[in-house]
Each structure stands twice: as structure tokens, then as C-alpha cells.
């Protein structure tokens, strides 16, 4: 948000009161399109006239208040690339402007809270790694006994979203326009999914922001967990306000909740071993205490959602399981904490006896069946996991085809580097490698055997994963050591988005080269 500092020269006393006029500033939409963030002059960017202008925005807002439908013909979409960019340009433009504007109060409040607390709030890039959540689970959950898998309600009333922003945005005109906009275009902007958290990648940034603010409202009710819990979050959104403002809203929410009937209930939740983790539309509560405490948590969450957020929350959406007998499926991994028995023979004088030690170990494996299902939908194999040739364009070169397969293979290997067992990952690499050969053979109308002879062993070495290459460079003389390290769990802190192949509930979009932003 530091980029906004040079563009918004507003009086600090009026920052919250005059956000509505910013909708008619052209640099707002330049920022929304990622133009000119690092330049002193915004309007010298090539192709900016194809994006947006204040005149277009004024017409859109006027027509929206008049409730006149804005219809573009096919010819307009062809003549103007900007109008053909989205199926619903009307809602897209307004939402992009809103997305930038509603973040302004958050940026100023962040600096204010930092100065009041006299400490620096953690930067968002230190919290963005998805893999950072697994060391936390490995360290904490191996000592817990029970886990509760909570499915966050996705039927959010639009008025609740607007009221959430009232704590930050004091401009009545902006709130009225936002309320009208949400009621008119909610169905056209939200992808119909099972959960509201599963936004498609083409959806506006505004709704990701609204969802994060809604989750912030929900998570700030965990006042009593602030000193006991760790909050390493992973989210598919590029905006990370929910952790930054977790502590800001605690004081306000404490007054609301401790003045009602929940005050007597909170005394039952004194558990120093309670931990909370959220990922996408689900959250996990882990505890070392008895199932009675977990059932009290269940009752508390159901009451919270029904009476505070006015969302119907069925108790069946919260599953309570014994951790040693339950597997958690999230972020492309299947995690469990099984009991591993270790038998030790002890000798004392002439007597010997066996000691059976039960130890808990956090394990993560790659669920091969969903992963093969995603490869099948992407036409890399059939439903049984047999590699097939993938249709390609006639003008695609052999090097482009090989590079694309290598990129997908390395991204998957990089993402699943924390797997305890690599057997499933080896099978995926085999599918991609053979599918690549069959694709090349289909293009040149030759047999697979012929292409294997033509490519030789160098082609197989190209599918060597990045982790193996790095470890072989670190330990060049001890190959067995590097192989042993590779077979272990390796967590990377540069993965900030879920790979589409392992995000089994989303669409299967594979044309992304960098695992950091797929």
C-alpha cells in the first residue's frame, strides 16, 4: 500500500469522509490495472486509453442509479478491446475502482496502529507462504489429541458485508453505492461454487477483499485465543488484511461479546493447548483436552454464526475426531498424526523385558487419486492413470511442448516437496513424462519407441526435479546424502499460491509457469 502514498494527497482528517469522489479519478483505475505503480507519471503508459476513464465511470454510475441495463453488442466487443475484456464490463469497472478505494482506510489505519503500539506489524510477505503452515502443524498438532474440522458458512448476507466495512469507511455515499452495487451484481460477479471462498481467478479483487474483511470479523471473536494460538494463514487472495487487523478489532469485539450471554460460556474455554488454523473455506481447531471441551466449542461456533452473523450454521458442519485416527485433507496434502510404536528390549541383570513406546509423528502424503483425477481432466492421462497424448497446436515447437511439461512437473515437485512418501509423486512424474513423449509422437506421427530412442537418456534427466539438482550441487561428493535429504520433507517459503493441479475444488487451469503465482 506504500505505492498509494504519492497519489493520494488528502487531508488526514478527511480521509474517511471523502472516498466517493475518488471513483471519478482516472489514476484509481490505472492502479487497479497495475499501471504506473512504480512510475511518477501514470498517464504515459501505452494502451492506457483502452482501460478506463472518468467519463466512462460517470456514465456507468449514472446508469446504475437509473437501473438501465447496459448491453454491449458483439461488434462493440470486437471494435473496443476494453469492452470485450469481460462479459460484464459494467460490474467489472466499478468493482475495480471500489477495490482500490476501500483499501485506503486500511492502509492509514495500519500505520496508526503501528505507531500506537510502538512496534512494527509483520510484513505480509512473511506470512504469505503456504508451506509455512505445515511446520506449525508439525510442531503443535503432534501433541494434541482431538481435532475439529470446521466448514465456514458461505451464505453471507450482503448487508453483513457492508456493515463490516462501516468500522473503517465513514463515507455514507460510498457505502450506499457499495450496497446498491452488491445487490444488483452479486450473482454476476460471484462464481457459483460450493463455498464462497472459491473465487475464480477472473473475479474482481473487491470480493476477495470483502471476504477477507468478513473472515477478519469472524476470527476477531477469538479474543481468548490470542495469547495461546498461532495464526499462520494461507489464502488464495493477494490481499492479507485479516492478520494485520486481527488485533485492531479485538477491543471492539470484546465489548460486544462480553456484554451478552457469551460471557458465562467463555470461562469454559480455558485451554492452553487450543490451536487454530484456517485455510480457504475451512478452519481447524486442535485441542489436547477432552471431547467435552470440543463439543462446547462446537456449540459456541454454531451460536456465533447464527446469532451474530445471521447465517444458518448446521452442527453437522463441524466434525470432531480423534487426531491419531483422522486425516486432514487440505492444500493438496493429506496430513495425519499416527501412533508409531517402537519396541525396545531392556536388560536388567538376568531379566529382560520389552518396552513398547508409542510416538506421534506428523506425516504428510500426496493423495494420488485426486491428483490423477486432475491430470485426467487436463488430458494428461485417463481416469485409470494411464498416460495419453495431449492435443497441441500445429505451430507449437518441440521445445515449447517439452518446456511446458517440464514446468508442470517441476512445479508439482516443488509444491509437494514436503511429502513424507514420494512414491505418489514419482508416479505423477512418470505420467507427465510419458504423456510428453506421446504428445510429441502424435505431432510427428511416429511411434513412442522411436521418440524414446531419438530423445535418449538426456530427456529423462530433464525431468530431474529442481530439489534433486540443488541438493546434488550442495553435496556433490555424497550422492547418497543428497538422495536421503530429498526423500525427506522439505518446506519452501516462496510458495504463495495453491497449484491448480492440487487445488481439487477449483478449475484446472495449467497455463502458469511460476509456482509462486499459479
Swiss-Prot record:
InterPro entries recorded: Domain_X, Maturase_MatK, Maturase_MatK_N
Lineage top rank: taxon: Eukaryota
GO molecular function terms listed in the Swiss-Prot or TrEMBL record: RNA binding
TM annotation in the entry: none
Disulfide bonds: none
One GO CC term on file: chloroplast
Keywords attached to this entry: Chloroplast, mRNA processing, Plastid, RNA-binding, tRNA processing
Location of this chain's protein in the cell: Plastid, Chloroplast
GO BP annotation list: mRNA processing; RNA splicing; tRNA processing
One Pfam family named in its UniProt record: MatK_N
PANTHER family found in the cross-reference section: MATURASE K (PTHR34811:SF1)
Function: Usually encoded in the trnK tRNA gene intron. Probably assists in splicing its own and other chloroplast group II introns.
Family indicated by similarity: Belongs to the intron maturase 2 family. MatK subfamily.
Record protein name field: Maturase K
Organism per entry: Syzygium cumini
